[in-house]
Amino acid sequence: MKEPAFWRTDGGRGSGALARALLAPLGWIHAWAVARRIRKATPVRIGPKVVCVGNLTVGGTGKTPVTQTLMQRLAEMDLTAASLSRGYGGREAGPLRIDPATHDASTVGDEPLLLARTGQAWIARDRAAGGRAIEAAGGVDLVLMDDGHQNPDLAKDCSIVVVDGLTGWGPGTIVPAGPLREPVATGLARADAVIVMMPDAATEPDWTGLGLSDLSIPVFHAWLEPLAPPPAGKLVAFAGIGRPEKFFDALRAAGGDIGEVAVYGDHHAFNAGDLRHLDALAAAHDAQLITTEKDWVRLPVDIQARVTAWPVRAVFANPGALDGLLRDVMDADMDAGGEAG
């Protein structure tokens, strides 16, 4: 789905304030349901440490690239990590270890398939069952739970909240009145660290505006950095992610010559009609098609060869502090039960 326009406005006449007000009671019910589920749950504790990379809003904040970077840094520390995702958009319920050679996005989801390119990746709609399956398979020091800050089923040793530094928490209203999954104060109270994703290294986060200046937990500044420059020549860029404009802006900032863009809903399943439309746009502009890695893995295999995937990675202003957080997680004594973060 595409985000309603009123999710990303600051209020005022004509900005969706009426829609938010009308939907606010449903948001309160949603927040109550989330809080009740967390309060009533008995989290399952597994042997490997569990670090959750989640957020407080619906839509793209950069969780998957952050998870990839964490997997890489853990590997550099001689630790074996496995990612655990719900598998949104895929048919398989799991628990299932992903094999990129045999699975595709329609079976396991796009984000888990992307994570499987970095390291061991699993899906499980039942996160506790997924954690047990990873533990039973053996050889894993730490599980990176991709999304799940509001899922209490698997006990966490560290909960990291990722937030888009430009859009922040939106207008502060809860789904369906806004992008929040739960109240900000409630979500941050369960967090052990926050990662603020900015457009680049030079753009400093508004710590005060985001309500992060007085937090007693680590707060990191990070951004997405392309692994290669955009292709030369005219481009037609398309994306079906939470915040497609971030992809288009990054392409332009890197020097990409975009003739036209095409926007699809998050996790969109591309069909023959979409591909004909994209081919027509490319022909009209004498351009090359380019998309995100996450979108590229959802394309039919016979189409992938003629579409460029533009990979990015999450880069941290203070990677040493990030490594320190991960070491602290590994060094911490395991509590007898319950949830650390």
UniProtKB/Swiss-Prot annotation:
Catalytic activity, as annotated: a lipid A disaccharide + ATP = a lipid IVA + ADP + H(+)
Primary enzyme class: transferase
Keywords, in A-Z order: ATP-binding, Kinase, Lipid A biosynthesis, Lipid biosynthesis, Lipid metabolism, Nucleotide-binding, Transferase
GO biological process, one term: lipid A biosynthetic process
GO function terms (MF aspect): ATP binding; tetraacyldisaccharide 4'-kinase activity
EC number: 2.7.1.130
UniProt pathway annotation: Glycolipid biosynthesis; lipid IV(A) biosynthesis; lipid IV(A) from (3R)-3-hydroxytetradecanoyl-[acyl-carrier-protein] and UDP-N-acetyl-alpha-D-glucosamine: step 6/6
Pfam families referenced in this protein's UniProt entry, alphabetically: LpxK
InterPro entries: LpxK, P-loop_NTPase
Secretion signal, residue range per the UniProt entry: none
ATP-binding recorded as keyword: yes
CC per GO annotation: plasma membrane
Record function comment: Transfers the gamma-phosphate of ATP to the 4'-position of a tetraacyldisaccharide 1-phosphate intermediate (termed DS-1-P) to form tetraacyldisaccharide 1,4'-bis-phosphate (lipid IVA).
UniProt cross-references to HAMAP family, sorted A to Z: LpxK
Protein family (similarity comment): Belongs to the LpxK family.
PANTHER family (alphabetical): TETRAACYLDISACCHARIDE 4'-KINASE, TETRAACYLDISACCHARIDE 4'-KINASE, MITOCHONDRIAL-RELATED
Protein's name according to its UniProt entry: Tetraacyldisaccharide 4'-kinase
Protein's organism: Maricaulis maris (strain MCS10) (Caulobacter maris)
